[in-house]
Each structure stands twice: as structure tokens, then as C-alpha cells.
Amino acid sequence: MVTERQQDILNLIIDIFTKTHEPVGSKALQESINSSSATIRNDMAELEKQGLLEKAHTSSGRMPSVAGFQYYVKHSLDFDRLAENEVYEIVKAFDQEFFKLEDILQEAANLLTDLSGCTVVALDVEPSRQRLTAFDIVVLGQHTALAVFTLDESRTVTSQFLIPRNFLQEDLLKLKSIIQERFLGHTVLDIHYKIRTEIPQIIQRYFTTTDNVIDLFEHIFKEMFNENIVMAGKVHLLNFANLAAYQFFDQPQKVALEIREGLREEQMQNVRVADGQESCLADLAVISSKFLIPYRGVGILAIIGPVNLDYQQLINQVNVVNRVLTMKLTDFYRYLSSNHYEVH
């Protein structure tokens, strides 16, 4: 059982340690804790006994353990605070014209990695929830073509493919017609299901040879099922993570899955501190926060760093970036949905 004073001591030690990265002694706490040095030492000993503090090898001071950071995140972290002193700099960073969603997400990721010194990942709306709103096929040459998908009337995904040997021009038109009739207006999850259930039967009515058509469907839609993900500060992993974690970030789709699995449907924010799960991120801290993408759903910002982070400062910064990012995205999508020639 941690008393109120012991919790104050733990919070203060974490605050000092994350700024100095030096063990903290009882004398450093006396100005802020209204108790004698002996009482503070006794409380520190009790916190150590409970596994929340640990001794330093080169000093008589104490530093927070992984369990101490976990306790702090669970009991003391304020998720609603804003870093008001940094609002201006963050707003200024977004004061530019962006031409696509990925550029806005990249700016948010770059900004957070500059502020934190950590690795940052930004995710678009979950692919399965996005809706196909337009489709076309562009012939590039005698044997190649490009499938062009528009999701949520704003995001474009392309897939180049080799036209099957037995395909005629009219077969490409059939393919385009089937996709437009059967898939437009449906979510990516629905489309994934239809490709495996309805499409095999439908193409038998339109094509003499069906095997290569099924394979073609699988190929051109594969990219649409992938996460839209941007990263910043991957090199920072070399300062606090092992090689396996660094190499894990060469697989963006797996990174996206790991981040989504760490944030439940009903959660808007979460902090994982060395949760010990079988993961390349098990020994790291992951701060995840959802942000609104107007008219479409929610995205996720995730900061990946060492356990000994200044969690409160990072949460404050993430909160500000989230709010400014949502404002910028609202303006971006309002422009997209308006009549271009009426916008001044």
C-alpha cells in the first residue's frame, strides 16, 4: 500500500530523474516534501521494498524502477493537461499549405520526434473502415495498366499490374464494371469478404478463364488492405532499443498492427510501459493517442521511447499536437468537400 506522501515522493523522484537522469537523494526532495529527511528516507526505503524504487550502483540516491514508472502512469499521469507554453510553436509548424493527408501526418510525426527525441508513428483511419468511393483503370502500355482506387473521397491508392495474356480490351472494361457495380460505396472490410465469396461466382458469368482473374483481383486490391502509415525518428531507436526493435520498424504493417493492438476500441489514449508481452516493443514505452480525422474516423499517433521518459511532458505535447492536427485536418477536408471555385 502506497501512502499519499510516498506517492508524492515517487512522483517527485520520477520528475527529477527524467530531467537529470541522475539518482535522487532525500535532500533533493526536502524543499518540496514537508517532512524531515529521516522520514523521507524511510518512505524511500518502503518504496524500494515495494519494488517502485531501486538503488543506483554509483550513488546513495534512488531511481525509479520499471514498476515505479508503471505505477506512476497508472496513478498519477494527467491525460488532460496541455503544454500551453508550446502551443504557439506547434501551431506555427502547421502554418503551411499541405497537398495531401500524408504530408500533414508526416509534419505531426516530425514535430513530435523533434520535441521528444523518440520514434513517432502516425496511422490513418483503419483500412477496414475506409470506403471505396471511386475506381478506374488506366492503360499504361500494351501489357500494363494501373488500378486507381479512391477511398473516403480523399485518399488515392494505386496498383500497377500486368494485363493477363488472354485479356482483350473489353475484358478490362468488364473488370472495371464489376468493381464499380459491386464495390463502390462499400467498406474495405466488405470488399475483402466479397472477393472471397461473391466474386468467384460473378466472374464465371463474364470470363471464359477465371483463374487469372481471381489472382488479378487479389493482386490489385492487396495494397488497399494495407495500413497508411508514416514514421519519424526511427534512428532514435538506436539510442534506447535493441537491434531487433530497430529492425522491427522495417516492417511498417507489423508496426501498425502492434500499435493498434495496444489501444482498445474505447480508449482515446494509453501508455504502455515495458509490459513484458512477447513483442519487439516489450522493453519500451509506447504512448498512443487517437485523433479525429473529420468525415472519416480516427487516426493514431504513437510515441515509442525508453522507459525513463518524462511522461507528463510528452502527454502534454501529444495533447497539443492532437488538437492542432485535428484543426488542420478539419480545414483540409472541408476544402476537399467544397466546390473548388467557390473557395477563396
Curated annotation (Swiss-Prot):
<dbReference type="InterPro" id="IPR023120">
    <property type="entry name" value="WHTH_transcript_rep_HrcA_IDD"/>
</dbReference>
<dbReference type="GO" id="GO:0003677">
    <property type="term" value="F:DNA binding"/>
</dbReference>
<keyword id="KW-0804">Transcription</keyword>
<comment type="similarity">
    <text>Belongs to the HrcA family.</text>
</comment>
<dbReference type="GO" id="GO:0045892">
    <property type="term" value="P:negative regulation of DNA-templated transcription"/>
</dbReference>
<dbReference type="InterPro" id="IPR036388">
    <property type="entry name" value="WH-like_DNA-bd_sf"/>
</dbReference>
<keyword id="KW-0678">Repressor</keyword>
<dbReference type="Pfam" id="PF01628">
    <property type="entry name" value="HrcA"/>
</dbReference>
<dbReference type="InterPro" id="IPR021153">
    <property type="entry name" value="HrcA_C"/>
</dbReference>
<keyword id="KW-0346">Stress response</keyword>
<dbReference type="InterPro" id="IPR002571">
    <property type="entry name" value="HrcA"/>
</dbReference>
<dbReference type="InterPro" id="IPR036390">
    <property type="entry name" value="WH_DNA-bd_sf"/>
</dbReference>
<dbReference type="InterPro" id="IPR005104">
    <property type="entry name" value="WHTH_HrcA_DNA-bd"/>
</dbReference>
<keyword id="KW-0805">Transcription regulation</keyword>
<comment type="function">
    <text>Negative regulator of class I heat shock genes (grpE-dnaK-dnaJ and groELS operons). Prevents heat-shock induction of these operons.</text>
</comment>
<protein>
    <recommendedName>
        <fullName>Heat-inducible transcription repressor HrcA</fullName>
    </recommendedName>
</protein>
<dbReference type="Pfam" id="PF03444">
    <property type="entry name" value="HrcA_DNA-bdg"/>
</dbReference>
<dbReference type="InterPro" id="IPR029016">
    <property type="entry name" value="GAF-like_dom_sf"/>
</dbReference>
